[in-house]
Every structure is written in structure tokens, then in C-alpha cells.
Amino acid sequence: MINLEKGFVYSMKEYTAMKKLFLLMSLGLFISCSSVQNPDYERNLEITKEWFETFGDEDLDNTMSYFADEIEYQSAFYGGPLMNKAETREYYQGWHDAMENINYEPQNFLPGVDPDTGLLNGSVRTYGSWSGTMTSSGKSFEGLWYHYLTFDENGKIINGGDFGDATGLIMSVKPDEE
């Protein structure tokens, strides 16, 4: 007999069975908590790749068609705000007006996680480099960037942002002062 707690006495057979049951329950809990790839990630990844191509085509209406009506988008400029859809459109219009031959070359695409739970949520992260030419100066640029895009159930972007040195990039390709 094994006395595990005051008042509870178990036979070796009962104790072994309880140990096995506890281990099986622990394994079940572990498996149920394991994160499985979000089934929407592959769809969202394809949408993300299309979106980057569309942005490079400088078709602003098509670029914005990938966004839901209610979005939050983070600007890459120093002190840049969290923007709604209208502000995001102006942000992209500024890039399209200032640059030409815009191209994004991804180094990788990664599944994103919910910041509150740490669980995969179908969002897409990417590291890569943007290149192009500043329209007003004719100077070329290339810079490393990080982007994140979160999607709703309809495949529309509801949250996203850019991380890169946007201010430095603009300063490096501005027209020379005379």
C-alpha cells in the first residue's frame, strides 16, 4: 500500500494505473496545446505575394483593394502614425509619386503569431529588400525592410506595417542641392 496523502491509501496496481492516466492526460494536454499551422496561412501567403507585385505595378486602386475597410497600418517613417485606410492610401500614394521601378525582393516569408497568445494566426511576415529609383533625382535605392500583414476571414488585410529606415532612404536619394 502507498499512502500518497493523509487519508488516501492506494494499492500499487491503482497507483500505477493513476500514473499512466496522469501521463496520458498530460500528453493529451500537450498535444492539444501544440500550435498547428493556421489553415489560412497558405492562402494569406499567396495574397501577400500578389499584394507586393501589385504595389510594384504602382496601381494604387488595386493595391488598396487588398485592404479591409477598417484597418490599422503602421508607417515606416520616424514618428509615423498608426493609420486608417484613407491615411494608408495617402502613404502609398506618396511612395508611388516619389518612386519608380519599385520592386520587392523577399528574402523569406514567415507565419505570424497572435501577439497576445503567441499562437499562429494566419498572418504573414516577410523580410526583404525594396529597390527602385527616386523620380525627382533619378537616384537608385535598395533597402532592407520587414513587413507584417494580418488578414480577416475574407482574405483582406486588417492590420499591417512596415519597418525600415524610410526617412533615411528618402534622404539618401533626394535631389542634390544646388
What is each stretch, according to the model?
Residues 158-178:
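Low-complexity, intrinsically disordered terminal/linker segments enriched in charged
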Residues 91-137:
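Surface-exposed, charged secondary-structure patches
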Residues 1-43:
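Bacterial Sec-dependent N-terminal signal peptides
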Residues 33-61, 65:
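Short, low-complexity N-terminal intrinsically disordered segments enriched in polar/charged residues
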Residues 72-83, 98-99:
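A short gly/proline-enriched turn/hairpin at secondary-structure junctions
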Residues 125-156:
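Exposed beta-sheet edge and beta->alpha loop/turn motif
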Residues 51-54, 58, 66, 70, ...:
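Structured segments of extracytoplasmic/periplasmic soluble domains
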Residues 51, 62-64, 71, 88, ...:
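Hydrophobic pocket/interface hotspot
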